[in-house]
């Protein structure tokens, strides 16, 4: 793992320079997004949600909401950007719900689409968001059990005691994690340890797209709204 300084504070969570370096490959397919997946695991709808940071909220049942910060205009960042967060958070992708983040320059930077820059500019911020959430959950569990964080590990949304039999899910400890201070440093995974990035996942909006569900600006409607168009280019 690689240690990096988070540069976060509690409520302005990620005012970070996201001038990322390095490229990556995330696998997903428009076609698989149109296929029914009978193996998808189900998680009960939470009774309560806990906001861990500006990218992540966790339900008491273990359901995870990850916010995708950049506009989705067909380039599939609404799938790929949350995958980066989920990788470092160490959660089961089948338990993740993706939501489009609102415009909020206090939380996010570079909220635009163009030039194939979304991943490139947000790579560091997305990874740190996931890693910071994971660290806060670990610290909450360590405090609950009165053990060092180094005695704990995570796997797909479950915290385990390395030398014991105790386990606790992210959903069970999330309420305690919201009170944990943002760590000054977090450990990022080595690229060789990626389990989610590089795999093929369905487009999160694939089913909505092929069934005509409202998704885009063109779908917006308000009572009394009038439409206009340009007759010819200015």
Identify the role of each PLM range.
Residues 2-27, 35-234:
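Cofactor-binding beta-sheet edge motifs in enzyme active sites
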């Amino acid at each position: 793992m690689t240690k990096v300084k988070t540069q976060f504070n509690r409520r302005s969570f990620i005012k970070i320079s996201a001038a990322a370096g390095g490229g990556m490959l995330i696998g997903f397919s428009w076609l698989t997004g149109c296929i029914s997946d009978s193996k998808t695991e189900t998680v009960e709808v939470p009774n309560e949600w806990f906001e861990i940071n500006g990218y992540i909220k966790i339900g008491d049942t273990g359901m995870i909401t990850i916010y995708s910060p950049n506009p989705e205009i067909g380039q599939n960042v609404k799938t790929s950007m949350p995958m980066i967060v989920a990788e470092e958070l160490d959660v089961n992708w089948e338990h993740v719900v993706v939501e489009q983040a609102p415009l909020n320059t206090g939380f996010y930077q570079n909220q635009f689409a163009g030039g194939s820059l979304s991943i490139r500019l947000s790579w560091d911020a997305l990874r740190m968001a996931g890693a910071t959430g994971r660290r806060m959950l670990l610290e909450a569990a360590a405090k609950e059990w009165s053990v060092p964080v180094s005695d704990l590990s995570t796997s797909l949304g479950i915290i385990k005691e390395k030398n014991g039999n105790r386990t606790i899910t992210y959903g069970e400890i999330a309420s305690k994690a919201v009170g944990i201070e943002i760590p000054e440093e977090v450990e990022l995974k080595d690229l060789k340890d990626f389990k989610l990035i590089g795999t093929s996942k369905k487009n999160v909006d694939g089913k909505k797209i092929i069934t005509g569900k409202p998704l885009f600006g063109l779908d917006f409607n308000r009572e009394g709204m009038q439409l206009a168009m340009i007759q010819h280019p200015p």
